[in-house]
Amino acid sequence: MPEIDITDPHDVRLAEYRTIGEAELVRRRGVFVAEGRLVVRRLLEDARHHVHSLLLNRSARDALADLLPRWIDRIPIYTCRTDDFPIVTGFDIHRGCLALAERPAEDRKSVV
């Protein structure tokens, strides 16, 4: 799957990112949101996580360029302008770096 340059912040392919502010909905979908270059980098480096997609501005894309070839055929990698993040997500994501990944199964033993 090639990188997808998003020119319209209302693009339907970004639907998952529109609801990241609704914690209960995100939890019910079984995903979590990673924000920021360091956190997303660690997520991409850790084989235990099933990453669904990335939403990056150009700067974040360049900062993660060394890792993206491993993921380019596996997940959608969306790029858009930093100014579009508030339109897409409802938040001023000034870092321009988000990932959606599968929430790990909760280990009930570790909760006790």
Describe every region a protein language model picked out.
Residues L44, T89-D92:
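Short, flexible helix/strand-to-coil boundary loops that buttress conserved ligand/catalytic motifs
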Residues H49, D92-H94:
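Short connector loops at helix/strand junctions that flank enzyme active sites
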Residues P69-G90:
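A glycine-rich helix N-cap at a beta->alpha junction
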Residues A99:
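Glycine-rich phosphate-binding loops that contact phosphosugars or nucleotide phosphates
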Residues S110-V112:
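Conserved small/polar residues in nucleotide/adenosyl-binding loops
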Residues E102-R108:
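Conserved phosphate-binding/catalytic loop of the ribokinase/pfkB sugar-kinase fold
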Residues M1-L67:
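Boundary-proximal intrinsically disordered activation/regulatory segments immediately upstream
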Residues S59-A60, D84, P104:
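Short glycine-rich anion-binding loops that position phosphate/pyrophosphate groups of nucleotides
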